[in-house]
């Protein structure tokens, strides 16, 4: 545990609540002190859904501390069972209430005997895993629970569907453009004549989980959630899974080719016809997706050699690193992820596509890295958006965590062939807006503003006088930030407090600003 005013991935119980609130007729009970109840408000605000968030807090108060939690927790489970009639109730503590070291598993077992609903305790180590890891573990636990129950009741049908079919695992609430990605992947599978067996956990019923083994394969669009479930199916049922991220034209083609290999392998067993998706890949790449054509246009060639920095979750950071570097000719000077548990896979994916790699969940290190790199554009999370604004660097948001403006009401997938178009737009426009700011500044547009000192730290820098600020304003905007930082660096090294025009020219000679 650590004290921080910003976290890229939240505490473990948030991941469990996200899985529970994604599923149909599932209720979560959170054993937590006051102050941990913000999930309901956060989800209602960001997802803009009409339904109430199915999560209830069993508050740890002074009475609980004096007498223990069992009576209160069991009463809350029974109350929600009577009021909501859910198929499943998931009981989870928070990192704070875990300090009490109470046997919540025993509470869940006792409640399940009395309740008409199934009750399980989220088996997550709240001190060792974050929000995304907990979501992955909780999803696998719920799936395993219902399949084991069906196996004991001898109601588990392991026969596969006649036509090729797939499960889509890992789409869930508060995900970055997850709803749009789900629609795009449904369309992709429909184009490939593959039936969608089930989507979990988003919109899925726990009573239908027993039908998951009927699919020919599992598709895992995100590394963060769904991988443990896919590995469980591979081990227990021999079901293949595809974890190649269908983002960008190149990886999109590779993902479809993997689907083709698995479908043709199973076609021999089920006496179905083999498939050939190469004409589909060619047609989509050349005529449907505009990104492939755009990457060869003169507009995109203007970005060749430009530098950028990418940071986000492992899935989006890896893909957004490869797309500009491989498909648009943009140099990625730094790329990184806050998913430290997936560092090995991340490094393997972006090998050769960037100059340096940063694996950290410390936003201060990320800010310092961005300040050193001085990129032409920045792609990251909401935090990198703030950092870019402070450093006057054009920026785009490509990964969670994000604020409400990135929960788009319009259709904006990042996966699939339509996703390639949606990615190309913000990548190009982020760079283009840098030139727009320059033109607005030259012609006295609405964007003229006082130049502020840019620094990734909170210390007070040297003071610019009116003459030096006037001289600085004459420098084009795209080079101004670099000149400003180099001059301030020179002033600090020389112990100069007030920056004059003479100091600016001295810094230029020494630092080649």
Swiss-Prot record:
Named cofactor requirement(s): [4Fe-4S] cluster
Pathway where it operates: Porphyrin-containing compound metabolism; chlorophyll biosynthesis (light-independent)
Cofactor annotation remark: Binds 1 [4Fe-4S] cluster per heterodimer. The cluster is bound at the heterodimer interface by residues from both subunits.
This protein's UniProt keywords: 4Fe-4S, ATP-binding, Chlorophyll biosynthesis, Chloroplast, Iron, Iron-sulfur, Metal-binding, Nucleotide-binding, Oxidoreductase, Photosynthesis, Plastid
Enzyme Commission number(s) of this protein: 1.3.7.7
Role, per record: Component of the dark-operative protochlorophyllide reductase (DPOR) that uses Mg-ATP and reduced ferredoxin to reduce ring D of protochlorophyllide (Pchlide) to form chlorophyllide a (Chlide). This reaction is light-independent. The NB-protein (ChlN-ChlB) is the catalytic component of the complex.
Listed name of the protein: Light-independent protochlorophyllide reductase subunit B
Origin species: Ginkgo biloba
Taxonomy of the source species: Eukaryota, Viridiplantae, Streptophyta, Embryophyta, Tracheophyta
Gene: chlB
